[in-house]
Amino acid sequence: MGHYFINLFTYTIIAFIFSAVLCKFLMKKMINYKFGYDLHKKEKIKVPEMGGLAVLFSNALFIPFVNPIFVLPIITAGIIGIVDDIAKLSPKEKLILLFISGLIIGILFYNNSYVNLIEILIIALGIMISSNLTNMLAGFNGLEIGMGVIASISLALVLFLDNYTTGFLSALIFSASYLGLLIFNKYPAKVFPGDVGTLPIGAFLAVLAVVYKEYIPFLVIMMPYVIDASLKYLSAGVMSRDEHKPTTLKEDGKLYYIGGYLSLPRLILKYKPMREPHLVTVLWIIGIFFGIVGILISLIA
């Protein structure tokens, strides 16, 4: 048991440090190659993008020490994210690529006796849907990465309580890698994650949920994403991420909702305008709440 906790501590700490150091390096390189502008600031701030590359490399390097097959959804979703960041895939193209990659991953997991035939399709659908959900709840400094860390830690604790050691350790390394990115992505953001950073979150968590049959806790943990996507769909139909216009920043430094499509952040701002870091904190608290509920459901079950 002592040896297990030493490995646990070692892998997670090194993954965190590696991700943070690599992210710092990439920020300097990407600022002149791939960058965007922070839309919720009074000044026009130039911010490097694709910081998720640091997390992709960190997870690809350290998760195989636990179980190599668990890195597959991260790498495939990450590659699709890179293509999307550079070439701007349409929503339909992104869904198709994620579904096809999900089928391939499902077959590989089936060949290694992790899932049955029906679960191959569940993995494909899970990767397609979940990756898009974690990609859509975004647009504010630290939001998507912070929510991803909360969701992955929540699922890690569910797996720990159910004695799934390999899944728990994989999810913990995954969380540590994203924490390394969050240091630079939190308000005020010094780097944006890009789709290479957001798509793998949903893909990895969906695969863990299917492999370890943690369907209900996973669905509960993902509820903030589901609510956000439902609000967007009901208010505006299917949109590409580029169509997600920023909220209004007024002279008092607060963000306001003044019409247009609804989302979870906009629903909050509709009733109480607030500053960007405060809004993100509220959303993190919502994520933590559903994470705790998911953990409690696992304990009861």
UniProtKB/Swiss-Prot annotation:
GO molecular-function term, one example from the UniProt record: phosphotransferase activity, for other substituted phosphate groups
Main location (coarse class): membrane
One Pfam family linked to the record: Glycos_transf_4
UniProt-annotated location(s): Cell membrane
GO CC annotations, alphabetized: plasma membrane
An annotated GO BP: cell wall organization
Residues passing through the membrane, by range: 2-22, 62-82, 95-115, 117-137, 140-160, 164-184, 191-211, 280-300
Protein name from the UniProt record: Putative glycosyltransferase MJ1113
E.C. number(s) listed in UniProt: 2.-.-.-
Bilayer topology: Multi-pass membrane protein
Enzyme class, broadest EC rank: transferase
Family, per entry: Belongs to the glycosyltransferase 4 family.
Native source species: Methanocaldococcus jannaschii (strain ATCC 43067 / DSM 2661 / JAL-1 / JCM 10045 / NBRC 100440)
Alphabetical keyword list: Cell membrane, Glycosyltransferase, Membrane, Transferase, Transmembrane, Transmembrane helix
InterPro entries: Glycosyl_transferase_4
Highest taxon in the source lineage: Archaea
